[in-house]
Amino acid sequence: MAQEPILTARGLVKRYGRVTALDRADFDLYPGEILAVIGDNGAGKSSMIKAISGAVTPDEGEIRLEGKPIQFRSPMEARQAGIETVYQNLALSPALSIADNMFLGREIRKPGIMGKWFRSLDRAAMEKQARAKLSELGLMTIQNINQAVETLSGGQRQGVAVARAAAFGSKVVIMDEPTAALGVKESRRVLELILDVRRRGLPIVLISHNMPHVFEVADRIHIHRLGRRLCVINPKDYTMSDAVAFMTGAKEPPREAIAA
């Protein structure tokens, strides 16, 4: 591709005792694209995503964001750098309101002495910004911004998590199995949300086992096998059967896909 990648990894190694989860793994994410990451169970894709999102520190290798070497020691550092992750378990607090969940860990304090010394939250500002972010993604069918997340449907909860990531992910959004355990209708809405986020210019890393969803929204598909990137394919040029065959080792990918 003519553009320079916004996020790259080279030679990542991660060991857990005698198990090598990442074996000199490479990764490239380009501006404005949806890159799907697929692989069989135990292929190491989760470890790779954890490495680029700050959840684990690689034993070897280098990660670069916008061309600059980075080393995250925690997910918080990754978030501060502009990389947001929507986890499979959503990482939402069910008892808290939608607005509180949107700003969880990033609460807005009141100006002046009330915020500085008494740590009072500026709930009006948080509610206003949360409402604006949900509206941007067409999610204001949720009537009450102060209702508890536990009262929402699965698709609505996923929408809140996606809206939070889109609101604060200034450079990259990572989505881990965003349609898992959702019905057909709710999955459709989440896929539309993913495309909405992409239209806003944010590149997305999509981890999913749902091949129809992957082939519907991805611009490129990164296939991970035996701890490393096996190949990168364009979903317009290959079938789902091809992808599964590459992923399981039943079929060798073409040379140009391996070099991608």
UniProtKB/Swiss-Prot annotation:
A molecular function GO annotation: ATP binding
EC assignment: 7.5.2.-
Pfam families documented for this protein: ABC_tran
InterPro entries tied to this protein: AAA+_ATPase (IPR003593), ABC_carbohydrate_import_ATPase (IPR050107), ABC_transporter-like_ATP-bd (IPR003439), P-loop_NTPase (IPR027417)
Protein name, as recorded: Fructose import ATP-binding protein FrcA
Reported function: Part of the high-affinity ABC transporter complex FrcBCA involved in fructose uptake. Is also a high-affinity transporter for ribose and mannose. Responsible for energy coupling to the transport system.
Keywords of the record: ATP-binding, Cell inner membrane, Cell membrane, Membrane, Nucleotide-binding, Sugar transport, Translocase, Transport
Cellular location(s): Cell inner membrane
Catalysed conversion reaction: D-fructose(out) + ATP + H2O = D-fructose(in) + ADP + phosphate + H(+)
Organism: Rhizobium meliloti
Domain ABC transporter: from-to ranges: 7-251
Membrane topology category: Peripheral membrane protein
PROSITE patterns, alphabetized: ABC_TRANSPORTER_2
Family: Belongs to the ABC transporter superfamily.
Residues reported to bind ATP: 39-46
Gene Ontology CC: plasma membrane
Subunit and interaction comment: The complex is composed of two ATP-binding proteins (FrcA), two transmembrane proteins (FrcC) and a solute-binding protein (FrcB).
